[in-house]
Amino acid sequence: EDGDVIRILEDGNAGSPRYEYVYDESSKSFKPKDEGQKMVVGTKYFALKAVNANYNFITVNEGKSIVELDLETGASDERGLPAIPLISDVFTADASGTVATMHHLCGVVEVPVNLSVEQAARKVTYFSIYSSDGKLAGKYTATPYPPYFLGTSTPSNTAYSEEKTTPYEAGDITVFIPVLPGTCTGVFLNVYFDGGAGGTYIDKDRQLVVERGKITKVTQVNY
């Protein structure tokens, strides 16, 4: 909307200068707040949505974004990163400051589910997948609602789907769960319903491989 603000952090540190781009409805684009607020042409930035609903952009450090380095090391929010969307992009600023050369931070697991009438009656609203070896969601935990924030909290081996406002109906449904890239085993599907939760193995002996920017589809789960 007109007047919406995009904030840009140069190096990801909380104390870094913050530049601002303001959305201009007439031109349908974000424009620098002033001449001193322009992104550097050719520089890579990382897009993340902050808690306050504005957008921050973090520069890439030697080929990897600050956020990606944090995911590898398990660092917390020392750089002022209150939340990281699982599905996000790295882009290079061009002359107009628009988005180019994107790639995804995570992959997505597609889980076909045949939900029984009995279970649907329990008002199922969201799902998660759990990995016995703890590699499924990296060192961060995701919230079960869009845009799938990665919170900087304790290590987690669980990743969540979107939480629906109305329960799933019985029958064949498809659940999409964003997951950090990697390989995991003993993958368990948790089903969350009104007042409790249940679960079933997707495939106890199967290795689940999640690739950046790709959808991994597993076999149907009957629940």
Residues covered by each model-derived region:
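A short, solvent-exposed beta-strand micro-motif common in secreted/extracellular proteins
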Residues: 41-56, 129, 183-195
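Short, low-hydrophobicity acidic/polar segments
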Residues: 1-121, 169, 204, 211-223
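Short helix-loop boundary/capping segments
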Residues: 88, 92-95, 109-170
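Short, hydrophobic beta-strand segments
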Residues: 34-37, 174-182
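Beta-strand secondary-structure signal
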Residues: 46, 108-112, 126-128, 176, ...
